[in-house]
Each structure stands twice: as C-alpha cells, then as structure tokens.
C-alpha cells in the first residue's frame, strides 16, 4: 500500500480501495458450489450448422464452375459450382450424375446434402429443375 501511495501520490483511503477492488475481482470470477448447484451445468451455445438456415431447398445463380479433388484415399474430379443463393450466401454445390450443361449465370436449385470426401461442399444441385438438365441416357 505504501508503494501505491509513494509512486502515484494517492491518499491512504484510495490505495486501500484499489487493493480491495483488485482482490474482489480476482475472487469474484469463480462460482461457489452452492451457486453452481443452483444454476446447473454451464452449457455452451454453439452457432447452428445448417447450411440453408433450416430450409430444404434454395434457388441460386451459378457464379463459377469448379472441379474439386477429394480427400486422401479417394481420387477423382468432382464437378461443383459456386452458387450465390437466394439467402445471400455464396456456397459450393456438387453436381451429381455424369456430365452437365451449367455455365455462369444459370439458375439451379440446391438441396442440403454434403459430399463426404470433398471438404467445404455442403450442398447438392437438383437435376431436372431450372437450368440444370437431367442426366442424358447413353445409347447402347
């Protein structure tokens, strides 16, 4: 306390209040057993992990067609598109099936469904709706 008074030139009463205040903040951080028992366990609130905010489908405009590579044991070229959704988000959507006709500014319908071996792809484009045609059947 004398150190505070000498170095900062404050009164004895202010120095004792400063020490008491710092002590209270250090002790006040922990809850007592009775307080923890009363309030129950502390549960963290995590942000929701829903890519389309709980909606099953969303319409979007294609910004760019992409080819993504899967994670380690698999090897392929997964056809994807970068889509600006009607919710305002920009996300990557996978195009299922063989071949597609998508270009920039086309409109697609996206559903929730992640691609397990490609990180960051949480949507799939729906074939046969808007500008994304059905899979063309091969002639034998």
UniProtKB/Swiss-Prot annotation:
Residues 1-30 form a transit peptide. PANTHER family: 30S RIBOSOMAL PROTEIN S12 FAMILY MEMBER. Its main location: mitochondrion. GO terms for cellular component: mitochondrial small ribosomal subunit; ribosome. The keyword Transit peptide applies. One of its GO terms (molecular function) is structural constituent of ribosome. Mutation of tko causes a behavioral mutation ('bang sensitivity' = temporarily paralysis in response to a physical jolt). Belongs to the universal ribosomal protein uS12 family. GO terms for biological process: courtship behavior; male courtship behavior; mechanosensory behavior; mitochondrial translation; response to hypoxia; response to mechanical stimulus; sensory perception of sound; translation. This is Small ribosomal subunit protein uS12m.
């Amino acid at each position: 306390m004398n150190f505070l008074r000498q170095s900062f030139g404050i009164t004895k009463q202010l120095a004792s209040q400063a020490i008491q205040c710092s002590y209270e903040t250090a002790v006040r951080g922990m809850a007592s057993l009775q307080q923890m028992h009363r309030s129950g366990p502390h549960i963290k609130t995590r942000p929701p992990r829903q890519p389309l905010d709980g909606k099953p489908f969303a319409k979007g405009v294609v910004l760019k067609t992409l080819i993504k590579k899967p994670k380690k044991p698999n090897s392929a070229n997964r056809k994807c598109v970068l889509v600006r959704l009607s919710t305002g988000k920009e996300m990557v959507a996978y195009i299922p099936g063989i071949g597609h006709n998508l270009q920039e500014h086309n409109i697609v319908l996206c559903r929730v469904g992640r691609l397990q071996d490609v990180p960051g792809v949480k949507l799939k484009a729906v074939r046969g709706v808007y500008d994304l045609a059905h899979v063309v059947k091969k002639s034998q």
